[in-house]
Structure formats: C-alpha cells, structure tokens
Curated annotation (Swiss-Prot):
<dbReference type="GO" id="GO:0009073">
    <property type="term" value="P:aromatic amino acid family biosynthetic process"/>
</dbReference>
<feature type="binding site">
    <location>
        <begin position="135"/>
        <end position="139"/>
    </location>
    <ligand>
        <name>NADP(+)</name>
    </ligand>
</feature>
<feature type="binding site">
    <location>
        <position position="94"/>
    </location>
    <ligand>
        <name>shikimate</name>
    </ligand>
</feature>
<keyword id="KW-0028">Amino-acid biosynthesis</keyword>
<feature type="binding site">
    <location>
        <position position="238"/>
    </location>
    <ligand>
        <name>shikimate</name>
    </ligand>
</feature>
<protein>
    <recommendedName>
        <fullName>Shikimate dehydrogenase (NADP(+))</fullName>
        <ecNumber>1.1.1.25</ecNumber>
    </recommendedName>
</protein>
<keyword id="KW-0057">Aromatic amino acid biosynthesis</keyword>
<dbReference type="InterPro" id="IPR036291">
    <property type="entry name" value="NAD(P)-bd_dom_sf"/>
</dbReference>
<feature type="binding site">
    <location>
        <begin position="22"/>
        <end position="24"/>
    </location>
    <ligand>
        <name>shikimate</name>
    </ligand>
</feature>
<dbReference type="InterPro" id="IPR011342">
    <property type="entry name" value="Shikimate_DH"/>
</dbReference>
<dbReference type="InterPro" id="IPR013708">
    <property type="entry name" value="Shikimate_DH-bd_N"/>
</dbReference>
<keyword id="KW-0560">Oxidoreductase</keyword>
<dbReference type="InterPro" id="IPR041121">
    <property type="entry name" value="SDH_C"/>
</dbReference>
<comment type="subunit">
    <text>Homodimer.</text>
</comment>
<dbReference type="Pfam" id="PF08501">
    <property type="entry name" value="Shikimate_dh_N"/>
</dbReference>
<dbReference type="GO" id="GO:0019632">
    <property type="term" value="P:shikimate metabolic process"/>
</dbReference>
<dbReference type="GO" id="GO:0050661">
    <property type="term" value="F:NADP binding"/>
</dbReference>
Length: 292
C-alpha cells in the first residue's frame, strides 16, 4: 500500500474497539488496489469515550468516510448531521460518508443489506419464510428491518437485555405498520418461547456476540431436537469461522450453516460504494477473506 500513498491519497477509517480481528482494512485496501483508487483504509481503536473527538477528526482532516463498529454504532448518532432512512429506522450506523470532504457527515447502515446478500449468495431466500433472530443490537435491528422489507412472512426477535426491549418494541411497531411481515419481540430468557420459535422457523439467525471470544465455547442452541434437516442456521460471527452454534448445527444435520464472512463482504461492499461511488470487486475480494 505504501507505493500508492501520495499527497492526494484519500483516507477512510474504522472506528471501533477491539479492532485487531477486523477484516475491513484488508478488504478495502485490496479493493482500492484492484481498482486503482487513491484511497487508504486505516483502523483506529476508538471507544465511546473517544468517539466525539474522533468524529471531529473526520471533519477536521477531511477523512472521506468511516466504518463504525462495536461499541459505537448507536453512540455516534447524535454526532452526525444526517441519517439515511434505514439508519434512522434502525437507530444505528455502521458507515459514515463525508461527501467531498466538506465535513457534512451522513450516517448509513449496511448490515441488513450485507446479511441478506450473504444469504442469497448461499441460495437462501427469506421471502414468505418464518425467521427467528436472536440479538437486537445495531446489526440485529438492521437485519430485522431488511428481512421485513424483503418479504419475510414472520420475524421473531429475541433479546436478553431487558433495558433494550422497550426501544426495540418501537421498531417492531413501525415494521408491522410499514410492511406485511409479522414482527414480534420476546425476551431470550424465555427459553420455552425461544425453542418453540426455532421449531417453527425456516431460518435461525444469531446476531449476538455469543460465539466470539470470550464466549467462544457457548451456543444459544444446545438441544439437538431443535436442529432439523430443513433448518438453515446463520451466525453473523466470522471469527472463529465455525462457532460452537454452527458446529452443533452441522453435526446434528441442519440443512445449511452459514458464518458471518459473507455478511462482512457484502456490508463492506455497500459501504465501499457509498464512500467511493465505485462497485467493490467482490469476486476478487471474497477469496482473501478465507485467508484469515
């Protein structure tokens, strides 16, 4: 990358913590090189305490855009000038665009688009399907919105944090008003309801952090009877590539198991397009993600 850097190079950033596991710098910098774009992508260890200063830095330095990940997806909202309709509905942002480097920052959310493109890539359609989704943080809410917009029959949301349930219920109400999808929300602590939902679902999506370190030895599903030959299991975690959940589902005969690498690729491709105006060469970038 050093050979490409010049006084004209445009900077794109990632604001998150931790960042060591992130595939984004590799993915975006390789895409810039493939397309001959004079951009550089750098990851910065930024938590919520440093976030306001970091956002001001984007404005002051003319950084052209930034990806935003945990724990900043919701905390960044009041620091931006505008939100896309999807980001406003979800209440979270994972991409910030500084158009022309003039300091007017617009927040977008590409997680839902990325997840649905990843599923489509695996031949999985959500239209008219019953789907159970665990975890309604920034990514989970974005996926829920996209599932409803893409014509799922039912989306059954489960979340463990009782304090978040009331805010997510507002999103549920909006989705039931705006789409034909039936969206419900329940506490993940209600294991009876959780298991019943999975038994009736075509697709189970884990959008929690269970499966990542330090929770890599845990799985939301531990009952073999919940895994059926017609059930697709999608875990948005990508490191490790096979979480405890995916290994369990594969072992007990799930129709298909999908990790989060495809979602990373396609949400990144959408962010890439928003910031650069160019299509990411996903076919060239996809093989690189398997090197991790």
């Amino acid at each position: 990358m050093s050979e490409r850097l010049s006084g004209h190079t445009l900077l794109v950033s990632l604001l998150a913590t931790p960042i060591r596991h992130s595939l984004s710098p590799k993915m975006h910098n390789e895409a810039y090189a493939k397309l001959g774009l004079d951009y550089a992508y750098l990851a910065f260890e930024v938590g919520t305490e440093q976030l306001a200063d970091a956002v001001q830095g984007i404005r002051a330095l003319g950084i052209r855009g930034s990806n935003v990940s945990m724990p900043n997806k919701e905390a960044i909202l009041p620091l931006l000038d505008d939100l896309s309709p999807a980001a406003e509905l979800v209440g979270a942002v994972n991409t910030v665009v500084n158009k022309d480097g003039k300091g007017h920052l617009v927040g977008h959310i590409t997680d839902g688009i990325g997840a649905l493109r990843a599923l489509a890539d695996e031949g999985v359609s959500v239209k008219n399907k019953i789907i159970t989704l665990a975890g309604v943080g920034g990514a989970g809410k974005a996926i829920a919105v996209q599932l409803a917009f893409d014509g799922a029959k039912e989306v059954r949301l489960f979340n463990r944090q009782a304090t978040r349930l009331s805010s997510v219920q507002k999103l549920v109400t909006k989705l039931n008003q705006l789409t034909r999808t039936k969206v419900t929300l329940q506490d993940l602590e209600d294991q009876t309801a959780f298991k019943e939902a999975i038994r009736e679902s075509h697709l189970f999506i884990d959008a929690t952090s269970v499966g990542m370190k330090p929770l890599e030895n845990l799985s939301l599903i531990t009952d073999p009877e919940l895994i059926r030959p017609d059930l697709v299991v999608f875990d948005i975690v990508y490191s490790p590539a096979e979480t405890k959940l995916l290994a369990f589902a594969r072992q007990h005969g799930a129709q298909k198991v999908i990790n989060g690498l495809g979602m990373v690729l396609y949400q990144g491709a959408e962010a890439f397009k928003l910031i650069t105006g160019q299509d990411m060469p996903v076919d060239a970038i996809k093989p690189l993600l398997g090197d991790e």
